[in-house]
Every structure is written in C-alpha cells, then in structure tokens.
Amino acid sequence: MVMDLKLIAAGLRHCGKVQAFKRGESIQAHVIKQGISQNVFIANNVISMYVDFRLLSDAHKVFDEMSERNIVTWTTMVSGYTSDGKPNKAIELYRRMLDSEEEAANEFMYSAVLKACGLVGDIQLGILVYERIGKENLRGDVVLMNSVVDMYVKNGRLIEANSSFKEILRPSSTSWNTLISGYCKAGLMDEAVTLFHRMPQPNVVSWNCLISGFVDKGSPRALEFLVRMQREGLVLDGFALPCGLKACSFGGLLTMGKQLHCCVVKSGLESSPFAISALIDMYSNCGSLIYAADVFHQEKLAVNSSVAVWNSMLSGFLINEENEAALWLLLQIYQSDLCFDSYTLSGALKICINYVNLRLGLQVHSLVVVSGYELDYIVGSILVDLHANVGNIQDAHKLFHRLPNKDIIAFSGLIRGCVKSGFNSLAFYLFRELIKLGLDADQFIVSNILKVCSSLASLGWGKQIHGLCIKKGYESEPVTATALVDMYVKCGEIDNGVVLFDGMLERDVVSWTGIIVGFGQNGRVEEAFRYFHKMINIGIEPNKVTFLGLLSACRHSGLLEEARSTLETMKSEYGLEPYLEHYYCVVDLLGQAGLFQEANELINKMPLEPDKTIWTSLLTACGTHKNAGLVTVIAEKLLKGFPDDPSVYTSLSNAYATLGMWDQLSKVREAAKKLGAKESGMSWII
C-alpha cells in the first residue's frame, strides 16, 4: 500500500509537470474510488498537480475538503497563489493558517509569503515575517534571506535590502544579483557597478542586470559592458543581445547594430520574436527602414503568431513617418488571426493622429472599446491625444476624466489640443491640475502654456512660467527658450525677449524668426533687419515666415524700398516662392504710397490668384488717394470673387462714401440688404 501511494503521488506530480490534464483527472478519480482522497500525502500531491495546471480554484476545493492538513498543504497553496499572480490570496491564506494555529510556518512558507509581500507592497507583514525568521534562527538560510532582500528590492527599499544582504554570511549569486537588480531598477547605476565589482564571480545574470539597467537609462555604457561580457568568455544570450540592439537604437549606432545582428544569427536566435523585434527596432531607429523591413519579411512566416514583431514593424513605419505603409501593415494585422494588444492599438491611433483623420480615428476608437483597452494606461492617453489633436476637445476632455491613471502623456495631449483649438482657459486649468498632482511638466507642456500666455498677452502668468523654467532647467532648452522669447515679445516686453534670445545656446531658424517678427511687431524695424543679417552671417537660411516677418515690419513702418528689396531677395537669392501674405505687404505699401500702377502690375505678375485682403487693401488706398477709377475695377473683382461676403459690401460702402460716389453707394447698400448684411455705421438702440 505504501508503494502504491508513492506511485500514485509520482503519477500526479508527473501529470502536473507535463500538463497531462485528462490523465491527472483520471488518477484523481482513481484516488477517490479507492477511498484514499483524505490521505494528506495524496491530497497534497493532487493540490500540487492543480497548481501546476494553474487551476487554483480546483486546488482550493481539494484543500477545503481535507479533514487534515499539514504545513506542506498550506505552503503549496500559498506558493501556488503567489506564482499565479494572486499574492493577496496567498497572504489571506497565510493569515488564516496563523489564526487556525494548525501548523507552524517553516522556511518554505516564509519564502512564499515574502514573495507575496514583495508583489503587493505589504512591507509591514514582510517585516513581521522577517522578525519571525530572526526569532526562529533562520537567518542563516541563504534562500530565505534572498526572499527578504527581494521583497525590499521590489518595493524600492534599498537601504533595508542592503542591510538584509549584509546579514547573509555567504551570499549566493542570487543574493548579489537581486541587490544589483534593485540598484539598476532605481537608476543608481554607479552603486550597481560598485556592487558588481565586489561580486566574487559575476554570472550571465549579473552582466545582464547591468546591461539592462544602462539600457533603461539610455546610457551607451550598456554596449561597454556587453563588449566586456563577451571578452570575459560569457555567451551573449537572448537577453543580452536584444538589450545591446536597443542601446544601438538610442545612439543611432548602425554599424554596431549590424555586428550584433551577426551575433544574433551565429547564436541561432534569428527566429526568436524578442530578438527579431529588437532588430527591427534598431534598424528603424537608425533610419534603415529597408533593413528593418527585410528582417520582418524574412521572419514573418516563422513568427506570424507573435504580434510583438508586427508591432515593432508598425512602430518602425511610424518613427520614419511612413504613415501609408503603417496603415497597410495595420490592415494586414487586422485581416490575420493576430489579436490587437495595447501596442498595436497605440500604433493605430498614432496613424490617425498623423493623418489628422477623425473618421478613421473613430473607427479605431470603436476597435479599442471592443478590445477592452479604452481605459488602458497607454491607449487611453493616446485616445485623448487623438481627439484633442483633431479639435474634438469636448470628447477628449470626457475621455480624460474617465482615465483611472492620468499620466503626463494624457495631460500633454489634451493641453496641446486645447492650445491648438484656442481653449486657453481649459489649458491653464489642466496645467494647474498637473502641478497639483505632482506630475513633472516637461518642456513641451511648458512651451504650450507659454503659447497661451502669448495669445492672452498674460505677462504675469508668463513670468511665473518663466520661473518654473529656471527651476527645472528648461530655460536653455530650444523649445522653451523660443516660447519664452515669443511670450515676452507678444506681451510688449521685447527687451526681456532679446536678453533671453541672446543668451540661448542653440538658435535655429524658428527662434531667429521669432525675434525678427517680434522686432517688427514692436516697431523696431532696424533691429529686425540687423538680426536678420546676423542670422544670415552665421549660416542659418531664412524661411518664408522669416521674410514675412521682415515684410510685415516694413509695412507697419511704411518702408516701401526695403519691402521691394526683401521680396526680390526672397525670390532671387533663396528661391522661395512668396505666399499671398508676402505680396499683400508690398501691395499695401504701394497703395499707401499712391503707386497704383505698380501695385496693379505686381498683382498681375503674381503666380497666385489675389485674395480679398489684397483687393481690400488697395481699395482702402484708393479712398485715401481719391482714385475713383481704380475703385470701379476693384469693386468688379471683389463682387465677382466674393459675392456672398458681407465684409466686401462694407468695404465698398466705405470707399464709395469717402469718394462721394453716392449712386454706387446706394446700389451696394441695396445689394447688402438683399444679402442680409448689416450696413456699416448703422445701429439701433431700442
């Protein structure tokens, strides 16, 4: 009978290991039939089998039906719940055992409970367990003490972890690696390296911990340790190589990436989804999309069950702004048997954002809802960004409020959308909420809030945001420095803007254009041209907006000759084709000077059809210079081109009244009444 029990127990354990579910059930049925199901030894093995099957409810049922239990019974259940990702259940069962006083915990139980405490962050219980370990003289157990160190590490309690580590007389490689991993996860790489050098015999796990830690920090030292690891004669495995490829992605190190690609092939990892994804990411981030696509297409058939590889290729297309290819790939994923995960859906939403396509976005949004990812940490934030980006601020705001975890991505997307759509008050409110929550406003959020200050000419708020920039070290960042200059310029404090601009370490065409436009807006046209020439002298090419800033400055200051010269320079020296706005500045100046023939010639030479603004500008000048003949021509152009625009009739009425052309004025007012336009200068007070 004893032999039979051992054979039955061995059979149950084997079924659990090889996942032979039906055979295991059959053996359990035999156990019940033989009337030995209440045998503690057999019942424990039945529980162990169900734990291996990850059928914890069945295991718990057997547990509850037992008339007698021992410490193995309790430990198997607690370990099972912990391993199955249900640490709260494990802790609950441990407390139940203590309350029942059926059994005293042993080192295996303590180890399982400490692991559960680490997962849920129950440090208080963990400390009580640690005290019990001390009272029972179990601190000499390396495996158990490793569990203590691991619990502290998982919860970022590195001082306590280090203290517990020092109590281990002969630390194992697991002891060292657990503590090194803790420092790496906390970003304390100098401490991790120091500990690594103290370790008697670092193994593959030790090296991988350091390499992974440097990758997480975006540090090129990851590659330094990868090379050192290989020189030490250790094998670069399926963890180290993808980490190395990721490090190459950060630095755009294509040559090194190709060398690691060879290592992947030599190591036989070319069919590993993890390695393939890393290769695709590396080539995509290094701007070699053709190589990335080659890797993807070569391995697609072998790994078509791994959505991670498809996600990497989708991300690669998006990084390189190949939106059409990304959309095509998304369609392929949809038509395959692959299930969309949060990364796939995030990629799909980014395509919609890039296309600014609300219709497509709503379709993807429906797919997100069906897939159950609407309130996902990543997907939810990008959904907010999508709706905000297309101007659908109301829906974006509703989605934002429904998110259980509002991260910086969600705030950033909504604030940017609000600024873009002119919801300045909401943008300010969101910014204040972000600060209250203790979230770290990045330079892009700050630059958007500065745009709000510029739009509202809110100097007080602008100065407060400037203070925040100094505190966070953003003042020297190009994106925030440019926004600060723009804010001071638009708030009328151009001298402060100039000081900031002159102190910028990096100045691109956008920042130069901003200060040039600012000088023009503040009537300092000479300085606008002086800074323009400074920009040219250091080799920065002006763009169309730069020239528009100069021409606007000339228009405001009545500098016709300078405007003529600037327009010609723009075309002949820089090959830039002017927009209507550029021509408008010169036409307006010619009109102000009464040079109507030259203005008309310029309009006729324009490669663009003149718009209402240009004709209206010339119309106003005709009134000033009493040019009734040209007014008739312009009136014909305006009425033919913009017959339904009430402002056209208002402008014509003003011109006719100025010139005393009463018959024409009467006709225009009659036409305006038919259109439903309100006559200029007329109001009724009831």
From Swiss-Prot:
A family per Pfam: PPR_1
InterPro entries hit by this protein: Pentatricopeptide_rpt (IPR002885), PPR_At4g14850-like_plant (IPR046960), TPR-like_helical_dom_sf (IPR011990)
PROSITE patterns the record matches: PPR
PPR repeat residues: 4-38, 39-69, 70-104, 106-140, 141-171, 172-206, 207-236, 237-271, 272-302, 306-340, 341-375, 376-406, 407-441, 442-476, 477-507, 508-542, 543-573, 579-609
GO-annotated biological processes: RNA modification
GO molecular function, one term: RNA binding
Region annotated Type E motif, chain positions: 614-686
Domain of life: Eukaryota
Alphabetical keyword list: Repeat
Keyword Repeat recorded: yes
Protein family: Belongs to the PPR family. PCMP-E subfamily.
This protein's name: Pentatricopeptide repeat-containing protein At4g08210
Source organism of the structure: Arabidopsis thaliana
